[in-house]
């Protein structure tokens, strides 16, 4: 993680960048309940990173949940401006992106023959972009304090799956755009009474496309 903070009399800035790597999950070896084979992962799929394996592979460490590793990076940028004696503006920018994220539960499913059902089942890189502006100001008439937020968020992700014995990858692409306006107002009447009220408007635009892609099986691994 890398972060930088800068500030002056009327403004401040915060920048943060985080890069994370999460490895495959390890299970404990002690099974006090008496079921020694419970949860063991004896077979797994090596069909990742463009590789094509026709059959399931033997897991030389059954306590290791293979294909659960993934990477992620996050970027945050915030600005805080003092617009006047009674007003402040905050700008917020965020971006995050992951690698492919495998569905371990789906990759562990078995068919009627007791073999692994899916060669691939993963979420494609999840991308999230977010931008917002928040204006906070004071007044002595209709309210004591007000916060107005304009925000936009974009999320892209996909679901990808392919069964063993097939070279067709089923892909479901999803794109979501979210627009929102949020306003909050606060007014104190006396020491014991106060009023809080607000308004929120949102608009969600979702686009979903499904299609199939032919997986290159020229370099077939048995």
Model-identified regions with their sequence ranges:
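Face-selective signature of the C-terminal outer-membrane beta-barrel domain
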Residues: 82-96, 124-222
